[in-house]
Amino acid sequence: MQFHSSSALITPFKKDLSVDEAAYETLIKRQIFQGMDACVPVGTTGESATLTHKEHMRCIEIAIETCKNTKTPSNSRMKVLAGVGSNATSESLSLAKFAQKIGADAILCVSPYYNRPTQQGLFEHYKTIAQSVEIPVMLYDVPSRTGVSIEVPTALKLFREVPNIKAIKEASGSLKRVTELHYYEKDFKIFSGEDSLNHSIMFSGGCGVISVTGNLMPNLISQMVNCALKQKYQQALEIQNKLFCLHQALFVETNPIPIKMAMHLAGLIENPSYRLPLVAPSKETIQLLEKTLQQYEVIA
């Protein structure tokens, strides 16, 4: 996986709650121009759970087309890590095959939610999906969402036994897990899935981030990651500290509720629309977001 900084993209909706494809393309181009290595369409932040199968595939397609046709400032191409998560292995497998067919660089696959599979079930789920494609696969551990964690031995077994499982997105909140994974397998790439822990995970052996805050501040997230990769940890920490209040504000309610409203307040999307069961943030949250964006001089 030849990327380090990336954003878990929001999926903008029109007022009628259809996907705003033009706005989506614009958001991806902004990521490209502000230095991100990759984008991650239709993950948790992209509200994949409320997209139809057709919409899910179309969002992946737009991301790939936009990255293919838009050069980065260094005249390269931004990579696409396509979200293919589902609580049905067959559906994830179908999405994985589609993503590979149309040119995704890699796929991100979350553990099945609601089903609460055993560790053997998780192993078979990921193994089945990975063996259906040739492109790299990133595991996604977020037990607060899925109800079950990919335990360290299971993650290591997947990495060791399935050749194209190359990385894991760590959103467990446990630095102990990160340390263990890196200790036992230095080549198992670890990406931070917790903005508040980006610097700490990079310092503990991580090689990149998949950021929610990056939707709003891609340039700063990219700078932080690049500093950490160059072992300029003090500079990376300064950027992490600079983003602290923003990271906090963007998670006062369930993601992606705050980030979509923040993007709207910043003038980056026209409609802060959500599909049920997600609803608009509270008045108090909107006020906090406005105050925070003023603090960062994003809005006047």
UniProtKB/Swiss-Prot annotation:
Give the matching PROSITE patterns.
Answer: DHDPS_2
InterPro entries annotated for this entry? Aldolase_TIM (IPR013785), DapA (IPR005263), DapA-like (IPR002220), Schiff_base-form_aldolases_AS (IPR020625)
Q: Which reaction does it catalyse?
A: L-aspartate 4-semialdehyde + pyruvate = (2S,4S)-4-hydroxy-2,3,4,5-tetrahydrodipicolinate + H2O + H(+)
* EC top class named in words: lyase
- The record lists pyruvate as bound by T45, I210
Q: What is its main location?
A: cytoplasm
Q: Which GO terms describe its cellular component?
A: cytosol
Keyword Amino-acid biosynthesis among record annotations: yes
* Active site residues per record: Y140, K169
Q: Where in the cell is it found?
A: Cytoplasm
Keywords, A to Z? Answer: Amino-acid biosynthesis, Cytoplasm, Diaminopimelate biosynthesis, Lyase, Lysine biosynthesis, Schiff base
Q: Which CDD domains match?
A: DHDPS
Gene3D superfamilies given for it? Aldolase class I
Query: Which protein family is named in the record?
Result: Belongs to the DapA family.
Name the PANTHER family on file: 4-HYDROXY-2-OXOGLUTARATE ALDOLASE, MITOCHONDRIAL, DIHYDRODIPICOLINATE SYNTHASE
What is this protein's function?
Catalyzes the condensation of (S)-aspartate-beta-semialdehyde [(S)-ASA] and pyruvate to 4-hydroxy-tetrahydrodipicolinate (HTPA).
Q: How does it assemble?
A: Homotetramer; dimer of dimers.
Please report the name of this protein according to its UniProt entry. 4-hydroxy-tetrahydrodipicolinate synthase
Give the organism the record lists.
Helicobacter pylori (strain ATCC 700392 / 26695) (Campylobacter pylori)
